Design a protein with these regions (language model features):
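Arg/Lys-rich, alpha-helical DNA-contact motif
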Residues: 1-132
Length: 132
């Protein structure tokens, strides 16, 4: 269990606001700009754990004046990276062989980690250039 909840738990807007300290307007803005989506069930919008953590991170950025509109660049970048990684592993991910699919999912997680590290290094390099 993570944070007292079962894996795969869903969170209401109130849960997300309470657990992240985010302004409810910020969460609505993130939905409006497609940064998070949530899922409507019975007239109530629920968010996954990852979306809750996105709200937490954006809440930190909001303290520096970064809002939903500014986050399009991050969302677009993540979408492009996901498409690239999916295209690399698409045949294995579609395989009917459960072992091959499992290996592809593990490779996908590894590639995500490596690309995240690469992005971090490129950002640090560019920020150092700005600072000098």
């Amino acid at each position: 269990m993570v944070g007292g909840r079962e894996p795969g738990a869903l969170y209401t807007l109130e849960d997300v606001v309470e657990e992240t300290g985010a302004d409810p307007k910020l969460v609505t803005e993130l939905v409006d700009f497609g940064v998070i989506k949530g899922e409507n069930r019975g007239g109530v919008r629920y968010f996954e754990e990852t979306e809750r953590e996105i709200v937490r991170a954006v809440s930190e950025l909001a303290r520096y004046g970064v809002g939903g509109r500014n986050l399009r660049v991050f969302r677009s970048s993540a979408d492009r990276e996901a498409q690239l990684l999916q295209s690399i592993l698409a045949p294995a991910l579609r395989s009917r062989n459960p072992e091959r699919r499992k290996e592809a999912i593990e490779a996908l997680e590894n590639l995500a980690s490596v690309t995240t590290h690469l992005k971090h290094l490129l950002l640090i390099r560019d920020l150092r250039r700005i600072a000098t």
